Every structure is written in C-alpha cells, then in structure tokens.
Design a protein with these regions (language model features):
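Short, basic, glycine/proline-bearing loop/turn elements
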Residues: 10-11, 23, 27-34
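Short solvent-exposed loop/turn micro-motifs enriched in small/polar/acidic residues
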Residues: 6, 20-21, 42, 48-50, ...
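Hydrophobic residues embedded in beta-strands of well-ordered beta-sheets
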Residues: 21, 35-36, 116
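Charged, gly/pro-rich active-site loop segments
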Residues: 64, 68-147
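A short mixed-secondary-structure module that forms the rim of ligand-binding clefts
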Residues: 29-63
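Residue-level marker for the onset of beta-strands and adjacent loop->beta junctions
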Residues: 9, 24, 53, 105-107
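A short, Trp-centered hydrophobic/proline-enriched beta-strand micro-motif
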Residues: 3-18, 55-58
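Short secondary-structure boundary/capping segments within folded domains
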Residues: 2-5, 17-20, 27-29, 47-48
Length: 147
C-alpha cells in the first residue's frame, strides 16, 4: 500500500452527519497503517469526523477503504512531528501555499482503515485491516473513465 498511496494521492472522503453523507476530494498520504489528511478544525469534514469517526475513501481507479478517522492535532504539536515531516514532503508543491500553520485551527486527520480494496499489476486485494487478512485475486481494471 505504501507504494501506491505513500505519496500525494487524491480520494473522495465521505463523512456523515445525522445520517446524511457528504463527500469531497482530499489529498491523502499513507504512512504506517493510516491515511493522513491536512485540514482545518472548522471545516465540514473535521466537524463531522469529531461527531462520527466512520468514514470512507474512494477514487476513480476503484480503490476504496472504510475506516475510522480521528483529529490528531495541530501540525506544530511535537507529538506528531514525524508525520508532519512526511506530509510536508509528500505535499511539498502546495503544503505551505495552502496552509497556515500559525492558524491554531489547522489540523491533521488520521484515517485508520478497517476494510478496503485496491489493485496493482493485475491483482486485486481485499483487505480486512481489523483481522489483518488479505485476499488476492486476478483483477483487470477495465472501467472507461469519463471526464
């Protein structure tokens, strides 16, 4: 997964409030066993994650994950310095242009996947992150993408 998603990778992030879903595209970075998103505490996604941590990620290449999200804090918090370093490198072309670390409401969201599907080199992988199992099978991505 690090090979595919351990870089700036765009997903649609879905959250929900009062059983009403909301989706938006976000830049993510996968590190360790989690996806990370840079955002603002007052954004709709952060507010919804605070109330309901159940989220999903998907992209047009059919990679999809469900999991639990948590706001892990402000980027200048020393406890998350290691992930900040990784995020500033992964998002180098735009990180400091679009984020203000002097803003006390800037934050990172960590998404710990519980289940997911991705494919690479003709193999599909169905993952259960909770049970730490993976099922591999032949897979051809033959969806015609329409812009």
């Amino acid at each position: 997964m690090k090979e595919l998603f351990g870089r700036d990778y765009q997903f649609a992030l879905s959250t929900a409030k009062n059983n009403i879903p909301s989706s938006r595209y976000v830049d993510t970075y996968f590190d360790g066993e989690s996806f990370y998103v840079v955002t603002h505490m007052l954004s709709q996604k952060a507010v919804e994650v605070s109330d309901n941590p159940n989220v999903s990620l998907c992209c047009q290449k059919m990679h999809a994950f469900s999991g639990r999200a948590k706001i892990i804090g402000h980027p200048l918090n020393p406890k998350i310095a290691e992930i900040r370093s990784a995020l500033t490198k992964a998002f180098a072309p735009w990180y400091f242009k679009h984020n203000n670390e002097a803003d006390e409401n800037m934050c990172y969201i960590r998404i710990d996947p519980t289940a997911g599907f991705f494919h690479k080199d003709g193999i599909g992988y169905k993952m259960d992150f909770t049970k730490k199992t993976v099922k591999a099978f032949p897979f051809t991505f033959d969806t015609v993408l329409i812009e």
